């Protein structure tokens, strides 16, 4: 066997391994994982935002800038976890993947793995978002 094809085969297998090491989380598993919790996400190694999950599938998303959005989540027929927010009525559907390192990745439908949101922390502390329609 020539060295170049062997190297190409090795590189192909090495790049495919991380994808094989991730498991898609079902909607039921997702509900058990997030209900009553706040997940903090990183993108490209930097803090990106956090989402608080309530018993009735309501959510509050907060960008690191502090901008908060309220919404709901549901599973679509493809098994993706979809979110609809008050400020954006179009569903945003994600696959949640569990890695061998125990961290979860959220991948927007049809986006490359490079744009994944990665859980930095799963806790129970509520987000600091004001209630809607409250004056100052």
Predicted feature residues:
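Lipid interaction determinants
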Residues: 17-72, 78-136
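Positively charged n-region of N-terminal signal peptides that target proteins for export
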Residues: 1-5
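Bacterial N-terminal signal peptides
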Residues: 6-15
């Amino acid at each position: 066997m020539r060295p170049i094809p062997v190297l190409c085969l090795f590189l192909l297998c090495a790049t495919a391994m991380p994808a094989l090491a991730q498991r898609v989380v079902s909607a039921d598993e997702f509900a058990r994982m997030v209900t009553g919790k706040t997940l903090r996400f990183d993108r490209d190694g930097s803090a990106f935002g956090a989402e608080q999950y309530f018993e009735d599938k309501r959510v509050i998303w907060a960008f690191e800038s502090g901008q908060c959005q309220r919404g709901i989540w549901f599973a679509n027929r493809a098994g993706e976890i979809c979110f609809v927010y008050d400020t954006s009525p179009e569903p945003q559907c994600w696959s949640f993947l569990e890695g061998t390192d125990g961290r979860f990745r959220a991948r927007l439908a049809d986006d490359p793995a490079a744009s994944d949101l990665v859980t930095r922390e799963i806790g129970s502390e509520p987000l600091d978002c004001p209630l809607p329609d409250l004056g100052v």
